Amino acid sequence: ETAAREGVFDPLFATTDKFNFEVVTLYTSGARHIYTNKPITKPEDLKGYKIRVQDSDTYIQMINLMGGVGIAMGQSEVYAAVQQHVIEGGENSEVVYNNFKHYEIAPYFSYTNHLVMTDVVVANKDFLDDMDEDTRATFRKLMKESMEVEFAAWDQNIEDAKAVLDEHGVTFVKADIEAFRERCMPLLESIANRSDMTREVYDKVQEIKAREA
């Protein structure tokens, strides 16, 4: 959140002009964590565990590095797949975990914090160019301000979901986040080194993380 507020991603977003759209703000969809039929506190706990991920080679590689086996699967298939022992669990935020009632088949929610998700809000450049200068400036200002509103709303969504999950007897587990991060460093470094710009953005995010630790 701090990185978004401080404009760390702005140089990256400026590259979208050539594609005729502009990034007008960033929203959050929270951090993602592992949920299964047992506590997951360290990479060794995931050994042999098949974890549902989105259909992405990067996501599959991430779970594999974390110690498990990444399985690409549609979200709507997860409940039955866990019930039938096709997979052992999934990874997502408390909100999605609650909405799909996955606590019924995977009652241990382990805070691995392996991904922090952002939603990028974009506007077509033609749409923006059709506005007069004052209207365009107001639009951009309000979109930036809406980020704080969305962040606060998401935090409330998390608290509301956790309250429901508590009622259903979910066990929240503290995981060794650093141990999982160490396992994923080869992937992180490969993504960071895709260009000078991504390297700079990654390093600035790490500086903020160290500052807030």
What are these regions (language model features)?
Residues F9-D10, A14-A213:
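N-terminal secretory/targeting leader peptides
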Residues E1-G7:
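Extracytoplasmic "Venus flytrap"/periplasmic binding protein-like
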